A protein has these predicted regions:
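RNase H-like nuclease fold core
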Residues: 1-49, 54, 58, 150-154, ...
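A short beta-strand motif that forms part of the nucleic acid-binding face
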Residues: 11, 24, 64, 74, ...
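Acidic/histidine-rich catalytic cores and adjacent linkers
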Residues: 15, 43-53, 60, 93-207
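A short hydrophobic/aromatic micro-motif that marks alpha-helical segments and, especially, helix-coil
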Residues: 26, 86, 187-189
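A generic structural micro-environment signature
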Residues: 28-29, 76-82, 172-173, 179, ...
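Conserved beta-strand -> loop -> alpha-helix junction used to position metal-binding or nucleic-acid-contacting
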Residues: 47-93
Length: 207
């Protein structure tokens, strides 16, 4: 919200925002401490769905933590663009778009197939102006390794499908914030305190 952040926890079952914090910036430690606070208040946290926050995903090893699949898709698009030209990038984009529609084993196999097909392409190097060897297709490599390294968090829903219903995206919370941002943008002249009051009324009005 331009000059401050609102961190929110929304309960998937009840569809209600159960807590929020207003902070000057967003960081993993705040989320970690907040989860601990909720647990101390006797909340039973059966699973967490979040956007890409590497340390946050790693910290909660005792709680199934699903990475939002659409955030992963967005990460890949930032690396290889929405309309990639190179064949390897086009194929990787198409593969990534299957994230929300397939299972862990199939996706892992397809990613391995893609790598085997393009590993020579990924390994290509050139000498730059500093007279050092650099990978030629750095952005493609970054996109691939992002998928590979995050794979264990992208299918937590699938791994726990018989235990608990975990969504694989944060769309249900993103929609709430999208609606709020649209409303708040109409009142940019409001002072911070009034703006926060408006946001909170909208936030809880969506409960």
């Amino acid at each position: 919200f331009w000059d401050f952040w609102i961190m929110a926890f929304k309960d998937y079952d009840s569809k209600k925002v159960i807590n929020y914090k207003i902070v000057s910036n967003e960081n993993n430690t705040d989320y970690k401490n907040w989860v601990k606070e909720l647990q101390e208040q006797w909340w039973v946290i059966r699973a967490i769905v979040c956007d890409w926050r590497k340390w946050l995903l790693w910290w909660f090893q005792d709680i199934p933590t699903q990475m939002c699949n659409f955030h992963q898709v967005a990460i890949i698009r930032r690396y290889i663009t929405k309309k990639p030209i190179l064949e390897a990038n086009r194929e990787l984009k198409s593969l990534t778009e299957l994230l929300t529609k397939t299972d862990k084993e199939s996706f892992s196999f397809w990613l391995w197939e893609w790598y085997e097909k393009h590993k020579d392409f990924l390994s290509e190097k050139v000498i730059w102006k500093d007279w050092k060897m650099h990978y030629l297709h750095n952005r493609t490599r970054s996109a691939y390794f992002s998928l590979k390294n995050n794979l264990q968090y992208l299918f937590v829903r699938y791994d726990n499908i018989w235990k608990i219903d975990i969504p694989n995206t944060t769309n249900w919370l993103e929609w709430v914030f999208g609606h709020i941002k649209a409303k708040v943008s109409l009142h940019r002249w409001l002072k911070k305190e009034r703006k926060i009051k408006l946001i909170l009324s909208l936030l809880y009005g969506k409960n």
